[in-house]
């Protein structure tokens, strides 16, 4: 499989409001979750890693509802919604993104795990790259090397598994729970499944440029 290139989809971009998602990736061997943000929930079944900015500050926080989360310090108030003092979370520890590198995360979907195993490549851990910004989201992005240039670049840098769970027509493949469903139609289905598993933190509406036709 090859990643879709930027210029291949550059025609026909327009701004549309759609659901983005802040999802909870369970940390391996710890009762805590890494909060990651995505504007393309349909890519989550193809996820193989999480990426942080090595130079930014990240925190482990405990929230009022008893959850422990990792995310960028600068985005805590925005994501955790502490409008009025006292903020509904406490900072337990601070880290640089680099220090979080290597932290293991549990996969959401079994379909990608089998593919990774066949490729004999390590996935499901935190990697670092300066392309991650703190302008939106949580300061943590999920990586699916089959989709998007940045993901592909990070995938090559860390020799991550390549999981392509979308066919040439833009439909989800048979390995996923959404076989034959067009990617954008799969978004709400993915979010619903994650919500039922308790892994969806939030699904705000988000406006961004998106290619409006597939090939």
Functional labels for PLM-detected ranges:
Residues 1-45, 104, 130-131, 135-215:
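Residue patterns forming the tRNA-binding/recognition surfaces of aminoacyl-tRNA synthetases
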Residues 46-48, 52, 56-168:
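Catalytic alpha/beta core of large soluble enzyme barrels
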